[in-house]
Amino acid sequence: IPQDLSGKMLTFPKEEDDDDVKLMTPK
């Protein structure tokens, strides 16, 4: 897994950055 902004956002907990995760991962 590349240590890019996208990767970091995906790995970050949803509770931590729900907004960021939503932007990166479409529901």
UniProtKB/Swiss-Prot annotation:
Binds 2 calcium ions per subunit. Keywords: Acute phase, Calcium, Secreted. The keyword Calcium applies. It is found in: Secreted. Residues 1-27 are annotated as: Disordered. InterPro entries: Pentraxin-related. Glycosylated. Its cofactor is Ca(2+). Coiled coil: none annotated. GO terms for cellular component: extracellular region. One of its GO terms (biological process) is acute-phase response. Residues 6-27 form the Pentraxin (PTX) domain. Belongs to the pentraxin family. Displays several functions associated with host defense: it promotes agglutination, bacterial capsular swelling, phagocytosis, and complement fixation through its calcium-dependent binding to phosphorylcholine. Shows sequence similarity to serum amyloid P-component-type pentraxins but binds to phosphatidylcholine. Homopentamer. Pentraxin (or pentaxin) have a discoid arrangement of 5 non-covalently bound subunits. Exists as a dimer under reducing conditions. This is C-reactive protein P1. It comes from Gadus morhua (Atlantic cod).
